[in-house]
Design a protein with these regions (language model features):
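Extended, folded domain segments that form the structural surfaces/walls around functional sites
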Residues: 39, 60-61
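Conserved G/P- and acidic residue-centered "switch" motifs that form tight phosphate/ATP-binding loops
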Residues: 36
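ATP/NTP-dependent adenylation/nucleotidyl-transfer catalytic domains that generate, transfer
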Residues: 1-31, 45-48, 53-56, 62-63, ...
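Short, surface-exposed alpha-helical segments at coil->helix boundaries
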Residues: 39, 43, 68-72
Length: 253
């Protein structure tokens, strides 16, 4: 874990300042606010780097979000401008249009949306929403990616959904390191220690992954792990999900 979290936090804030000075000196940072630790910490870092007036939080429930009050508490505590966009109607309209599409049943053999499509479509709609909001801001915007290094390592994200963005402050920090940074920021501590979940299944991230972030973090940082089955699963997830972090392959004639 971080030996000097204070200096890492200061370096992160400066990194965000430097990114914007080179890639949009007057732009705002647009951050999707879920009410979890990662988006809260990214928003707080952006506020410290750019000032509250240049950070726009976007809350994007899909219909009813059980922890929407946490997301509202984040933007209220940070004092940043925010927009609430309920993507429920867009999700319903898109999935219905797909199901009713000419040839859908013939080609897919289905009359509904698959579980994977149901899980991954909302994050992609949210990323579309963030870019649309950004392009409506007076001075433009850059969209924050809020994934952390532990999630990235095992591919616990949606390609072109929450894995997208313009800049990624937490990509090289594992979960416990992110929490170390969070404890140094002016944010509610219960959000820093909040159990990560997808907000869909009622299960925590760790329940779905089959191992704890503590085990994963240690393995990423030291290569040490006790359970060979857990090591095999982590290695497998890392291998099959590498494409999410790589540029699209292209043919060179």
């Amino acid at each position: 874990m971080l030996d000097h979290p204070e200096s890492t936090k200061e370096a992160l804030v400066q990194w965000i300042r430097d990114y914007f000075s080179q890639n949009g000196p007057s732009c705002s940072a647009v951050v999707g606010i879920s009410g979890g630790k990662d988006s809260t910490i990214v928003a707080a870092l952006c506020k410290e780097a750019l000032g509250a007036e240049r950070v726009v939080g976007v809350l994007m429930p899909n219909g009813i979000q059980s922890d929407i009050d946490d997301a509202k508490a984040v933007v209220a505590h940070l004092g940043i401008p925010h927009i609430i966009v309920n993507i429920g109607a867009a999700y319903d309209a898109l999935t219905n249009a797909i199901i009713q599409g000419e040839g859908y049943k013939t080609v897919t053999g289905r009359t509904d949306i698959s579980k994977d499509a149901g899980i991954n479509t909302p994050p992609r709609l949210r990323m579309t929403t963030l870019y649309a909001v950004g392009q409506n801001l007076p001075n433009g915007a850059r969209v924050a990616n809020t994934c952390n290094g532990s999630e990235d390592y095992v591919g616990y994200s949606t390609k072109y959904g929450d894995s997208a963005g313009d800049f990624s402050p937490l990509a090289n920090l594992v979960v416990e390191e992110v929490r170390q940074i969070g404890r140094l920021l002016d944010i509610p501590k219960y959000l820093v220690d909040k159990t990560p979940s997808d907000g869909l299944s009622g299960l925590s991230d760790e329940d779905k992954l089959g191992f704890t972030y503590a085990v994963l973090d240690r393995y990423i940082r030291t290569g040490e792990i006790e359970n060979p089955e857990t090591k095999e699963r982590i290695d497998y997830l890392n291998r099959i999900n590498k494409h999410k972090l790589e540029l699209m392959p292209s043919f060179h004639p």
